[in-house]
Amino acid sequence: MIQMQSYLGVADNSGAKEVMCIKVLGGSKRRYASIGDIIKVTVKEAIPRGKVKKGEVYDAVVVRTRSGVRRPDGSLIRFDGNAAVLLNNKQEPIGTRVFGPVTRELRSEKLMKIVSLAPEVL
């Protein structure tokens, strides 16, 4: 579960290393985001010659969480850390590669590009 002020790693090659959630999108009093949800983030740490700079604000989709996601069969998919993929204004990934596994819950119409870039889908 991701909430405001949560720090997440970045699972793409956009140039950001760490981002902080500043808003959970979807509803005025929505408090938590889980895998597949879109959040508003600010870049807290970036590499020198990346596509994004420290302090910039982007949309991001949560691809991995420590709390995990429960499947209909009762199994729980859990990860070691929280991670997100940065999106541009058209909700397309900024980076051209996605690092680490992602879950099958991302297989919606608007997020298929992230699933196709990922090396492993759990």
From Swiss-Prot:
Task: Name the Gene Ontology molecular function terms of this record.
Answer: large ribosomal subunit rRNA binding; structural constituent of ribosome
Q: Which domain of life is it from?
A: Bacteria
Q: Name one GO cellular component term.
A: cytosolic large ribosomal subunit
Entry keyword Protein transport:
no
Against SMART domains, the record matches this protein to: Ribosomal_L14
Assigned keywords, A-Z: Ribonucleoprotein, Ribosomal protein, RNA-binding, rRNA-binding
Q: Which PROSITE patterns match?
A: RIBOSOMAL_L14 (PS00049)
InterPro entries attached to this UniProt entry: Ribosomal_uL14 (IPR000218), Ribosomal_uL14_bac-type (IPR005745), Ribosomal_uL14_CS (IPR019972), Ribosomal_uL14_sf (IPR036853)
**GO terms, biological process:** translation
Belongs to which family? Belongs to the universal ribosomal protein uL14 family.
- What is known about its subunit structure? Part of the 50S ribosomal subunit. Forms a cluster with proteins L3 and L19. In the 70S ribosome, L14 and L19 interact and together make contacts with the 16S rRNA in bridges B5 and B8.
Query: What does the UniProt record say this protein does?
Result: Binds to 23S rRNA. Forms part of two intersubunit bridges in the 70S ribosome.
Query: Protein name, please?
Result: Large ribosomal subunit protein uL14
Species for this entry: Xylella fastidiosa (strain M12)
